[in-house]
Swiss-Prot record:
Main location: cytoplasm
Domain remark from Swiss-Prot or TrEMBL: The MATH/TRAF domain binds to receptor cytoplasmic domains.
TM region positions: none
Molecular function GO labels: ubiquitin protein ligase activity; zinc ion binding
ZnF start-end (TRAF-type): 133-186, 186-242
Subcellular location, record wording: Cytoplasm
Coiled-coil blocks: 269-307
Stated family: Belongs to the TNF receptor-associated factor family. A subfamily.
Name listed for the protein in its UniProt record: TNF receptor-associated factor family protein DDB_G0290971
Length: 445
């Protein structure tokens, strides 16, 4: 649990801040609520945060202050001196304030929400650079009570004392060998391992774990009421068919059940015949289903063999000096040479700044058929935008699309990566300024 704050509220000496530490465009400090911002400058030394530069260069290729031409982020230099100087500023520990729930960091009332806790708060004054590490180690940070059901939020130093008296604290049950939240007395009334006496009759003196009670009553307890399995078939003699389990053996010995037993045997024989018929029918159904499965497996194998014989293309496409292409206008694309896939030719076309105005600022990727006077062809195709960190690769797949014969036709994704994000810092470009896209094309039957 952390105190919500803006870095401006933690500063010990606001007067020591100069305009050099504030972005002249968005007027925010060069530091977010949890990490420093990157500061970039034009060749004439005018500063702004990275996000402001990125947004501005999408509209105008110039410095926002002096109008010096700036074609891309690669033409800016990073001002680490300003970044590091801000990290040396002194701040109060966030845990010097009271914890207040449901406070938004961006709320305009934030200054009113943060209140110093002079009695119990942290007294440390640290640098901005040490802030994150200190918060992890601070003994005055806020923690939620670990016991289920307790919603109290306390300082770490107060948790140990609170746990002693917390009504939701866990207790160890010797019977079930578990930590139990709440009171042990209440748990003992339902604990499956607590030994209890049989509840079927006071005459039964046996005891066992609670979880075995139902099994004992159903199968073992001699005082459980049971029925004679024969008398229920013919009760014309008005004999009682309910007995305590220990009386049943005596009943079977004294009463002749031969007639009833014959009925049971006859019924079982009829049931046996019915079961045999059902087994025969099930076996027939099984044989038919097995035949269908074999046929389907053969069809699947034939389809796979046919698909493997169909034309396909798989290779990596490299777009060199891609940073220069990011300056292209909307609907201005760059294409590969024609790629042979069987009797068809295709080309991959990228629109670095969008195919049209609706996807401006995004890279649009389309596959075009350039074969002339060829019949329609159905394909599946995949674009894989490769990142230096392969875990971040982006895959875009079209399961099925039919390219019509004759006229040039194309299909793809109007929005893939954001244009501004495609640089070497984010891993989308190599050190040689190359964008690498894996392309797979499969002709379908």
């Amino acid at each position: 649990m952390t105190v919500k704050y803006s870095i401006n509220e933690l500063l010990v000496d606001h007067e020591s801040l100069s305009d050099n530490f504030t972005c002249p465009i968005c007027f925010d400090l060069y530091y977010s609520s949890s990490s420093k911002k990157e500061v970039f400058q034009c060749r004439d030394g005018h500063l702004a945060c990275k996000s402001c530069w990125s947004d501005s260069l999408l509209n105008k290729k110039e410095c926002m202050i002096c109008r010096t031409p700036v074609n891309s982020m690669n033409e800016l230099s990073r001002n680490r001196f300003i970044e590091n100087e801000f990290l040396k500023k002194k701040v109060y520990c966030p845990n010097s304030f009271f914890f207040i729930e449901n406070v938004n960091v961006d709320d305009s009332s934030m200054n009113e929400a943060l209140i110093r806790d002079e009695s119990n708060g942290c007294k440390e004054i640290i640098t901005v650079e040490a802030l994150e590490k200190h918060q992890v180690e601070c003994q005055f940070r806020f923690e939620k009570c670990p016991f289920t059901g307790c919603d109290k939020i306390l300082r770490l130093k107060q948790i140990a004392e609170h746990k002693i008296d917390c009504k939701f604290s866990s207790k160890y049950c010797l019977h079930c060998d578990k930590e139990i939240p709440g009171q042990l007395d209440a748990h003992a009334l339902v604990c499956p391992k607590v030994r209890i006496q049989c509840t079927q009759s006071e005459s039964c003196k046996k005891s066992f774990p609670r979880e075995q009670l139902r099994l004992h009553i159903d199968q073992d307890c001699k005082f459980t009421i049971v029925k004679c399995k024969y008398c229920c078939l013919n009760n014309s003699k008005n004999e009682s068919i309910d007995f305590k389990r220990f009386e049943l053996a005596d009943h079977y010995e004294k009463v002749n059940h031969s007639f009833e037993m014959d009925k049971v045997i006859n019924n079982q024989q009829l049931e046996l015949v019915e079961c045999k018929n059902q087994i025969y029918q099930i076996n027939n159904k099984y044989e038919k289903l097995l035949e269908r499965v074999i046929k389907l497996e053969q069809l699947s194998m034939d389809a796979s063999n046919k698909l493997s014989l169909l034309p396909r293309f798989k290779n990596s496409i490299i777009f060199a000096t891609f940073s220069t292409h990011k300056l292209k206008r909307v609907n201005e694309g760059i294409s590969t040479v024609p790629l042979d896939v069987g009797n068809n030719k295709f080309k991959l076309t990228l629109y670095p700044n969008g195919y049209d105005e609706s996807n401006k600022g995004n890279i649009s990727a389309y596959l075009y058929r350039v074969s002339i006077n060829e019949p329609a062809v159905k394909v599946s195709f995949t674009f894989v935008f490769n990142n230096q960190d392969s875990r971040k690769n982006r895959t875009y797949r079209i399961q099925e699309y039919t390219f019509n014969g004759g006229a040039t036709s194309g299909w793809g994704y109007p929005k893939t990566l954001k244009t501004v994000d495609v640089d070497s810092a984010n891993g989308w470009l190599t050190d040689e300024d190359k964008l690498v896209i894996g392309l797979r094309i499969q002709v379908l039957p």
